[in-house]
Curated annotation (Swiss-Prot):
Residues 192-207 have a biased composition (Basic and acidic residues). This is Protein FAM110B. Residues 130-247 are annotated as: Disordered. InterPro entries: FAM110, FAM110_C, FAM110_N. It comes from the Eukaryota. Residues 224-236 have a biased composition (Low complexity). It is found in: Cytoplasm; Cytoplasm, Cytoskeleton, Microtubule organizing center, Centrosome. One of its GO terms (cellular component) is cytoplasm. Belongs to the FAM110 family. Pfam families: FAM110_C (PF14160), FAM110_N (PF14161). PANTHER family: AGAP005440-PA (PTHR14758), PROTEIN FAM110B (PTHR14758:SF2).
Length: 397
C-alpha cells in the first residue's frame, strides 16, 4: 500500500465537518428561531395544580370545595435583622472603616448585655419577693457568686442576709482549693455525731452487735448478706463471733428491739440457706428403677405368654406344655422380685448415709434384665411350643 494514500486518509477532519455530521441538515436549515423557541418557557402550558383546578368539577361533589381556591404553599421567609449602614470617612481608608465597624459591633453587644442584665434583675426580684413572702426570713450568709455579673448599684440589694439568688439555687458554688464551705463541714460533723450516738445507743441495747455501725445495720435490715456489705464498704468492721447459749438466753429475757429482731431473723435465714445448700440433690433410689424395669418385663412376658395363639389351639396343645415352657420365665420373675426386695433394703440403708450414696451413685448400675437374655428365653419358649405341636401331630397319626 503506498504512503500517499495513508497520508491522504490520515488528514484531520475540520470542525465544520464534525458539526455537520452530529446535527442533521434538516434541523440546520430551520434557522436560529427554532432553537430560541426551545429555550424559552411555554406560556400556554398549564401546571399540574392549574389543570386539577380546571377539572375539579369532575371529581368533587360539594360546591364549597369547588368554589374554594387552593393557594400555593410558600416557604416562610425569616425576617432578617436590619443592618444599619456604617458611615465611612473619605480620607480614612480601609482601616478607619474597620475600626468604625468594630466600635459599632461593640456598642451593639453592650446594649444587648445590658438588656439581658435588666431582664435577669427583674426576674430575680420577682423570685426573691415570692420566696420571702412564702418562706419568711431565712438564716444564712450572703451569696456573692452571681453578683459579679450584675450592676454595682444592684449588688447591695442582693447581698442582704434574707435574699437568695436564682442562679445560686440552681448551681452549686465551686469549692476553693484547700477550703470547704462551712455549711458542708457542719453537715459532716452533724452526720458523724448522729452516727456515734446511734452506735452508743445500739451498744447499750445489744452488746453482741456493738461493733456494727448504723450503715451495716441498715444493710442487714434491708436483707443484704453480710459478705456483700463487707465488699461494698471498705471501712466496715469484722463480723462478731457467734454468741453462746448464755448470751442468747440473756437476750431472750431482755426486751428485744426491732433492729435486734431483724438481725436475728436475717441470721436465721442465712443459716437456713447454708443448710439447704449443704443438702445433696435428690437421686432416684435403686428400688424405683428396678421396679420400673420389672414392670416393663412383666408387660412383655404377658404378651408372649401365649404367643398370640387362639384359645382353640391352646386347648388342643394343652396348658401343661405352656407351664413347662413358662418355667424359665416364672423363675425369672421370682428372681426379679427377690432383687426388688433386696434393693429396697439397700435403699433404706443408703438413706441413712447420703454422702456414701453420692459417691457410689456414678458406679452403681440399676438392676435389669438384658435384652439378649430376654430374647433368648422367648426363643427357647417358642421352640418348646413348636416341639409340643409336632409331638401332638405325631401322636394323632
Amino acid at each position: 500500500m503506498p504512503t500517499e494514500t495513508l497520508q491522504a486518509d490520515s488528514k484531520p477532519v475540520g470542525q465544520g465537518g464534525a458539526f455537520a455530521s452530529a446535527v442533521p441538515l434538516r434541523i440546520l436549515n430551520k434557522g436560529p428561531d427554532y432553537f430560541r423557541r426551545q429555550t424559552e418557557p411555554n406560556p400556554k402550558r398549564l401546571s399540574a395544580v392549574e389543570r386539577l383546578e380546571a377539572d375539579k368539577a369532575k371529581y368533587v361533589k360539594s360546591q364549597e370545595v369547588i368554589n374554594a381556591k387552593q393557594e400555593p404553599i410558600k416557604p416562610q421567609v425569616l425576617a432578617k435583622p436590619p443592618v444599619c449602614p456604617v458611615p465611612l470617612k473619605r480620607g480614612g481608608g480601609v482601616g478607619s472603616g474597620l475600626k468604625a465597624s468594630n466600635n459599632n459591633a461593640k456598642s451593639d453587644t453592650c446594649a444587648t448585655t445590658t438588656k439581658r442584665e435588666n431582664l435577669n434583675l427583674e426576674i430575680l426580684k420577682n423570685i426573691l419577693n415570692s420566696s420571702s413572702s412564702s418562706e419568711g426570713p431565712a438564716k444564712g450568709t450572703s451569696h456573692k457568686v452571681g453578683a459579679r455579673s450584675w450592676a454595682p448599684h444592684r449588688s447591695s440589694e442582693l447581698s442582704e442576709p434574707g435574699c437568695r439568688s436564682f442562679t445560686d439555687s440552681l448551681k452549686v458554688p465551686p469549692s476553693t482549693q484547700g477550703r470547704h464551705s462551712p455549711q458542708g463541714g457542719n453537715l459532716n460533723l452533724s452526720r458523724r455525731l448522729l452516727e456515734e450516738r446511734s452506735c452508743e445507743v445500739d451498744g447499750e441495747r445489744s452488746p453482741l452487735h456493738a461493733s456494727h455501725s448504723s450503715s451495716d445495720i441498715r444493710r442487714m435490715c434491708n436483707g443484704k448478706p453480710l459478705r456483700a456489705a463487707r465488699s461494698s464498704s471498705s471501712s466496715a468492721p469484722p463480723l462478731p463471733p457467734k454468741p453462746s447459749a448464755k448470751a442468747l438466753a440473756a437476750c431472750d429475757n431482755a426486751p428485744c428491739s426491732p433492729e435486734r429482731e431483724t438481725l436475728t431473723s436475717t441470721a436465721a435465714e442465712l443459716e437456713l440457706g447454708s443448710s439447704v445448700a449443704r443438702r445433696p440433690s435428690l437421686h432416684r433410689s435403686k428400688s424405683d428403677l428396678s421396679d420400673r424395669y420389672a414392670r416393663a418385663g412383666a408387660d412383655v412376658e404377658r404378651f408372649f405368654n401365649y404367643c398370640g395363639l387362639d384359645p382353640e389351639e391352646l386347648e388342643s396343645v394343652g396348658v401343661e406344655s405352656f407351664a413347662r415352657a413358662n418355667s424359665d420365665i416364672v423363675s425369672l420373675n421370682f428372681r426379679s422380685a427377690s432383687m426388688i426386695s433386696s434393693d429396697c433394703e439397700q435403699s433404706r440403708h443408703s438413706n441413712d448415709d447420703l454422702t456414701d450414696e453420692e459417691d457410689d451413685a456414678g458406679e452403681r448400675v440399676p438392676y435389669g434384665i438384658s435384652a439378649v437374655e430376654r430374647n433368648a428365653r422367648i426363643i427357647k419358649w417358642l421352640y418348646s411350643i413348636k416341639q409340643a405341636r409336632e409331638s401332638q401331630k405325631v401322636s394323632h397319626v
